From Swiss-Prot:
Class of this enzyme: transferase
Gene3D superfamilies: Decaprenyl diphosphate synthase-like
Keywords, comma-separated and alphabetical: Magnesium, Metal-binding, Transferase
Cofactor: Mg(2+)
Assembly and oligomerization: Homodimer.
Binding sites annotated in the UniProt record for Mg(2+): D23, E210
SUPFAM superfamilies membership: Undecaprenyl diphosphate synthase
GO biological process: polyprenol biosynthetic process
Listed EC numbers: 2.5.1.-
Keyword Metal-binding recorded: yes
Protein name, per record: Isoprenyl transferase
Length: 244
């Protein structure tokens, strides 16, 4: 009886919105004597498994850092391969995601992304548009600082008096605001592969997120690792700068 109540209480403490910095693909591949692109391909398969498990756990939104504005500085061949991954991912896994009632969305600047990449994202979003389960949100060509700048520029163009700008008003113009009305900022942000930094991911939105740094490289991050991160979150005491 007590265990059932405890389990129910923990489920009620689920993070609604999880952000994931999928790190370690290249290092994982190097350890296996493989090229970096081998790690990116393995990471694609991990993403499907983690997304499905998150949806089944009852997570409402999962935002994954797929490609940052800084990633353009990587070798040309690697960038080209990464840009092909959405095409492969959606063609391979959209049927599974549809069956799991998962919605596909994207944030980030469309300008600069290859047409084939954008077409695959748009097609996946359209094919899952009638789903009402977890939102799987891909941050592509995304940077947190750039997100804030674009929001301010948009407000300035609309004639907004920026001297009266509030946090609430700015939040409404950030890219995550288009995902869902009244979308929560990330409750939990996970970074894999042992690195402990945010790397310009959801800079504004992560102000009060709980952070979880997993030692596991992204290609090895699975449903059990996600459960460990959620369990750690459930043990945190979130005070939002106050005192309890």
């Amino acid at each position: 009886m007590f265990n059932n109540l405890k389990n129910k209480e923990q489920e009620e403490l689920l993070p609604e919105h999880i952000g994931i910095i999928m790190d370690g693909n290249g290092r994982w591949a190097k350890q296996k004597g493989k090229p970096r692109i081998f790690g990116h391909k393995a990471g694609m398969d991990s993403l499907k498994d983690v997304a499905v498990h998150g949806a089944r756990r009852g997570i409402k939104v999962m935002t994954v850092y797929a490609f940052s504005t800084e990633n353009w500085t990587r070798p040309v061949d690697e960038v080209k391969f990464i840009m092909s991954l959405p095409i492969d991912f959606y063609s391979k896994y959209v049927p599974v995601l549809k069956e799991e009632n998962i919605q596909i969305r994207m944030i980030g600047e469309r300008e600069g992304l290859p047409k084939a990449t954008l077409d695959s994202i748009d097609r996946a979003a359209q094919e899952t548009s009638e789903n009402d389960g977890m939102i799987l949100n891909f941050a592509m060509n995304y940077g947190g600082r750039r997100d804030i700048i674009l929001a301010i520029q948009e407000l300035a163009k609309s004639g907004q008096d920026l001297s009266l700008l509030t946090e609430e008003e700015l939040s409404k113009h950030l890219q995550t605001a288009v995902l869902s009305e009244n979308l929560r900022d990330p409750d939990l942000i996970i970074r894999t592969s042992g690195e402990q930094r945010m790397s310009n991911f959801l800079t504004w939105q992560s102000a009060y997120s709980e952070l979880y740094f997993a030692q596991t490289a992204w290609p090895d991050f699975d449903d059990k690792e996600l459960d460990k991160a959620i369990s750690a979150f459930q043990k945190r005491d979130r005070r939002y700068g106050g005192v309890k």
